[in-house]
Amino acid sequence: MAATSLMSALAARLLQPAHSCSLRLRPFHLAAVRNEAVVISGRKLAQQIKQEVRQEVEEWVASGNKRPHLSVILVGENPASHSYVLNKTRAAAVVGINSETIMKPASISEEELLNLINKLNNDDNVDGLLVQLPLPEHIDERRICNAVSPDKDVDGFHVINVGRMCLDQYSMLPATPWGVWEIIKRTGIPTLGKNVVVAGRSKNVGMPIAMLLHTDGAHERPGGDATVTISHRYTPKEQLKKHTILADIVISAAGIPNLITADMIKEGAAVIDVGINRVHDPVTAKPKLVGDVDFEGVRQKAGYITPVPGGVGPMTVAMLMKNTIIAAKKVLRLEEREVLKSKELGVATN
């Protein structure tokens, strides 16, 4: 009983959003009277979170524990995947986490990949494990995600972690949705009783964002107590507008450039852009990254807005580092029915 209680307290401390933000942030209701939205810097927030993780890692190591280790499996030659993995391993170095990238050709069989995952699952030196998505078409991504040990699943994609998140229980939260949640909480944007629209229903991004925002703030894994509407590819834009124009918070994770425009947003709303789209820039004649939101138009009307790039992206990497230290501390122990052994908790036994 004592072990379970102590585990819950330790898990709560690790998984709770921090409120010691050093950024000077404008109260939500005041942002609405500005001529232009407050642009939320995901880079600054991510830097703060990485500083918190680094301090936690060094305290963990100073207490006699081994330095956390993250293993990343990268399949194929997708340039975007290589870039994302490089960002993750660089962030790991910044926060004091050891990391390795295991590169495999796109021709690797599903069984070979499963065998590699099983080997890393059973390696005590590996605390966090992720397989960079997307994978080649001949490999079942869901089977691969479920093969990663839920205790090491720093992406939060295992069915156990997804299920526990949906039940408002402690779990490894998916990094991008958790990053969106932290942006909202650390910026001081209220969610209780507010109307939220999430554009996009993907199982790794849109759905988890909606779950985090609408669930009960008094539960084991506190939610936002918001009223959430989810749209998807079959939602006509005019129907979407009927919802967004009433929303206090609009989160777009659909992967459609200019999906959200100024006429769809009410004055003072918070707009979080999760979309990442490569489009042709007519000025430079080169590709450029944009989100789902017409940034220049919407910023004239919204209260808060995140840019692309520099918004949600850096937060995703920061939350991945947070999940890795959680995995290293073995706080969740999902495969052992959530109960830590007394010796792991430092509890004296007779």
From Swiss-Prot:
* Keywords noted in UniProt: Acetylation, Hydrolase, Isopeptide bond, Magnesium, Mitochondrion, Multifunctional enzyme, NAD, NADP, One-carbon metabolism, Oxidoreductase, Transit peptide, Ubl conjugation
Q: Which protein family is named in the record? A: Belongs to the tetrahydrofolate dehydrogenase/cyclohydrolase family.
User: Which PANTHER family does the record match to this protein?
Assistant: BIFUNCTIONAL METHYLENETETRAHYDROFOLATE DEHYDROGENASE_CYCLOHYDROLASE, MITOCHONDRIAL, C-1-TETRAHYDROFOLATE SYNTHASE, CYTOPLASMIC-RELATED
GO CC, sorted alphabetically, is: extracellular space; mitochondrial matrix; mitochondrion
Return the EC number: 1.5.1.15, 3.5.4.9
Q: Where does substrate bind?
A: Y84, V85, L86, N87, K88, V131, Q132, L133, P309, G310, G311, V312, G313
Q: Describe the effect of R233K.
A: 50% decrease in NAD and NADP-dependent dehydrogenase specific activity. Reduced affinity for magnesium
- Give the GO biological process terms: folic acid metabolic process; formate biosynthetic process; tetrahydrofolate interconversion; tetrahydrofolate metabolic process
Any idea which residues the transit peptide spans? 1-35
Kindly list the positions annotated as binding NAD(+): G200, R201, S202, R233
**Other noteworthy facts:** This NAD-dependent bifunctional enzyme has very different kinetic properties than the larger NADP-dependent trifunctional enzyme and is unique in that it requires formation of an enzyme-magnesium complex to allow binding of NAD.
Q: Which organism is it from?
A: Homo sapiens (Human)
Q: What is this protein called?
A: Bifunctional methylenetetrahydrofolate dehydrogenase/cyclohydrolase, mitochondrial
PROSITE patterns in the record:
THF_DHG_CYH_1 (PS00766), THF_DHG_CYH_2 (PS00767)
